[in-house]
Swiss-Prot record:
Name of the protein: SPbeta prophage-derived uncharacterized protein YonP
Length: 64
């Protein structure tokens, strides 16, 4: 059975993959592009931001 921290890490890595796919396909918003660029530069994401919360919502509703 997975620990909670492993579940969070797994979901976060899938979320980053989901975001990268959206960027490659050209379906990511400018805010999502900025979120990803900040993640690449600083290695962290502001999980309290509206963009992050919206991205999580889109990810959970997707078939990704």
């Amino acid at each position: 059975m997975q620990k909670d921290s492993e579940k969070v890490t797994y979901m976060f890595s899938n979320l980053i993959g989901f975001l990268e796919t959206a960027i490659i396909e050209g379906t990511a918003s400018q805010e999502e592009n900025t979120l990803y660029e900040d993640y690449k530069l600083f290695g962290t994401i502001d999980k309290k931001s509206y963009t992050y919360k919206n991205l999580v919502h889109k990810y959970l509703k997707s078939d990704y």
